[in-house]
Amino acid sequence: MKKLQASVRSHKKQPANHKRRRTRALSSSQAKPSSLDGLAKQKREELLQASVSPYHLFSDVADVTAFRSNLLSWYDQEKRDLPWRNLAKEEANSDRRAYAVWVSEVMLQQTQVATVIDYYTRWMQKWPKLQDLASASLEEVNQLWSGLGYYSRGRRLQEGARKVVEELGGHMPRTAETLQQLLPGVGRYTAGAIASIAFDQVTGVVDGNVLRVLCRVRAIGADPTSTLVSHHLWNLAQQLVDPARPGDFNQAAMELGATVCTPQRPLCSHCPVQSLCRAYQRVQRGQLSALPGRPDIEECALNTRQCQLCLTSSSPWDPSMGVANFPRKASRRPPREEYSATCVVEQPGAIGGPLVLLVQRPDSGLLAGLWEFPSVTLEPSEQHQHKALLQELQRWCGPLPAIRLQHLGEVIHIFSHIKLTYQVYSLALDQAPASTAPPGARWLTWEEFCNAAVSTAMKKVFRMYEDHRQGTRKGSKRSQVCPPSSRKKPSLGQQVLDTFFQRHIPTDKPNSTTQ
């Protein structure tokens, strides 16, 4: 760390053209706007600069250079060995390289690295090229994606692959702008990640990890979801990205946020850009305030009420939080509550054992195209759920005995914006229904169910049914139909795969003033 700090001090002597370079570092673009949109954008830039203190900027080109150098040196030594990084580095074909990055970035959205590794490996083994994915069926895509969540990601990924093959001659767009414009489901971040990692385009990215790093190094405490703050963060990312190694730089910034500059208990003493971090400096100022003499540490020159990037008066600095004061979490609406009744219908099977009935969800909306047990949506005070569910079952199976419909309990599953409570029922048939399953329905063995394109919520329902059918208590030993990967998540005391890809670092608390 002393070497890293020394590299910052080494930039005190500035060349003769420093003033010109510093001016360039302050602005991401000096181009004269050629349209009304360009003029509007320039006006927004001017208003933003007028309301922002240099405290929240990288005003000195020496700091930009040091940030790049220190971060990349750390990344070269500490980066995790991940399959998508190896593919991006080793693949000579630029289209395959871009495809490999694309798949990883889509899978990593809202999903932990440890979870993605297995899915990514199986995906690339099954569909190593864009053309392979384009020719696959949506059912195959949903089946492999089962359990990963946010299922529209897989569908849009395949839609994008088909567009590249059918409309773009099999060649991926080469820039962040065209990637975002031409490919469905590709937003600004994903486009920038693909363009910088696969094609070396000098473009910055801002994901959740980068956002946290930037908010801390420049002490940005305003709502990170606001248009003004988001615009400022993207400007910072574009200013900082290393022109010689844009892909590595972006991955390094994400890696720093994921492994060192974490949401809770960040490892500040191991941070390669600690000496440039405003949040860390503020913690140090608090710790040194009791010593003789006031430490010379820069602060925001504007009044807090004037600066639109500082912590607000309604949410001031909390010494106990340390650097975790940044970024401040935006208020989130609680997920809306919905209720459903679902039933596991079983009929006697042959060699493969009993069969359960699955029906396919609509092609759009929540869990589009996935398979589930027959279900009906209920009102919270629904008094006749038994009758409503039986009517739904008869739609798929024909006349059924109501007296055999048995209530097993309830399963709660929380999606990103919905808390869904399932009332779980079972119905055992003595023989197969008189009619065959209609379109949109099918009978599967237990083993087939575990490998089908079903949601995690349905696997929870099936586990309740499994436990009840086998007459076992929760936690007792029994044979498992579904493989462990599709069952419960590891407990808090159990190591997850991600831990094997991190260098062991002892926990410290340099971010707290209560040391």
Swiss-Prot record:
It is an enzyme of class 3 (hydrolase). Residues 1-24 have a biased composition (Basic residues). This is Adenine DNA glycosylase. It comes from Mus musculus. Its cofactor is [4Fe-4S] cluster. The record marks D207 as: Transition state stabilizer. GO terms for molecular function: 4 iron, 4 sulfur cluster binding; DNA binding; DNA N-glycosylase activity; metal ion binding; MutSalpha complex binding; purine-specific mismatch base pair DNA N-glycosylase activity. It catalyses: Hydrolyzes free adenine bases from 7,8-dihydro-8-oxoguanine:adenine mismatched double-stranded DNA, leaving an apurinic site. The lineage of its organism: Eukaryota, Metazoa, Chordata, Craniata, Vertebrata.
